[in-house]
Amino acid sequence: MFFFQMPRVPELLFSAWNFRAGARSLLRTSRAGTFTPEDLSRYRAAWAQPGAVTAMINWYRALFRYPGSFRVGRIEVPTRILWGRKDAFLHSSLAGVSHRQCTRAELIWFDQATHWLHLEEPEAVNSALIGFFSTPATP
């Protein structure tokens, strides 16, 4: 994340060689077969839009520039957290942090899933979400 604090350099490296770094990152951090060549072409087309890469990187820049801005109170509404244990970007301990931030939360682990849980386990994710949204909340 410190790398993203530099001006322009992250954008140049991410965009170089037809967004090779971005495509490799998707492939390295997901289960085999998650991203097809067609998927990668679509990502490259999206990344090529003016300002897209800077917008993505600015999220990480803001974490360091405005650290106090991201404080959130307790989450009081029913919450279901879905988490891939093999997430290369978000350490599994953050799932517990998120869970403790909620007064009524359920944490569901996906042992073989990565950061791309919704792409790797779409049926299970959809089932978990439909079940959650179909259940009336209790006060």
Predicted regions located by residue number:
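Short, intrinsically disordered terminal tails adjacent to the first/last structured region
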Residues: S127, T138-P139
